[in-house]
């Protein structure tokens, strides 16, 4: 069975990535992919990590209201949006999930970045 990442790329009309999978969308949205045997994870940095704790708490509260999870990157320099799909997802589910993820990232960038 072909990987979910390759099926998503095919659904988007793109060739499968040969090296580190990365898509750049519209206005500089960079989507990185991490694939395991069980999931396909999409990750997109969308703004610098806030300096004040109240702003950071606000973003963490958003995790309760959306399938898109907000976290910090490994260097603790940026907020990232994360979305996971099971490998058993169909091409349609992967495409719908990708579109939902991009829509959420655009909203986050529009309102907060």
UniProtKB/Swiss-Prot annotation:
Coiled coil: none
SUPFAM superfamilies: Type III secretory system chaperone-like
Inducing factors: Transcriptionally regulated by InvF and SicA. Also regulated by SirA.
One Pfam assignment: Chaperone_III
Gene3D superfamilies named among the record's database cross-references: 3.30.1460.10
Keyword entries, A-Z: Chaperone, Cytoplasm, Virulence
Protein's UniProt keywords contain RNA-binding: no
Localization: Cytoplasm
Main location: cytoplasm
GO cellular component term, pick one: cytoplasm
Family note: Belongs to the IpgE/SigE chaperone family.
Role according to the record: Molecular chaperone required for SopB/SigD stabilization and secretion.
Oligomer status and interactors: Homodimer or higher-order oligomers.
Protein name: Chaperone protein SigE
Lineage of source species: Bacteria, Pseudomonadati, Pseudomonadota, Gammaproteobacteria, Enterobacterales
Gene expressing this chain: sigE
């Amino acid at each position: 069975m072909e990987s979910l990442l390759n099926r998503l790329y095919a659904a988007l009309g793109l060739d499968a990535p040969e090296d580190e999978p990365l898509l750049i969308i519209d206005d500089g949205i960079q989507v990185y992919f991490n694939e395991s045997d069980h999931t396909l994870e999409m990750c997109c940095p969308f703004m610098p990590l806030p300096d004040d704790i109240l702003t950071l708490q606000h973003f963490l509260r958003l995790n309760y209201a959306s399938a898109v999870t907000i976290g910090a990157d490994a260097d603790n320099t940026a907020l990232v949006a994360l979305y996971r799909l099971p490998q058993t997802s169909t091409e349609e589910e992967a495409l719908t999930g990708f579109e939902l993820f991009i829509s959420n990232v655009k909203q986050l960038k529009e309102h907060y970045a």
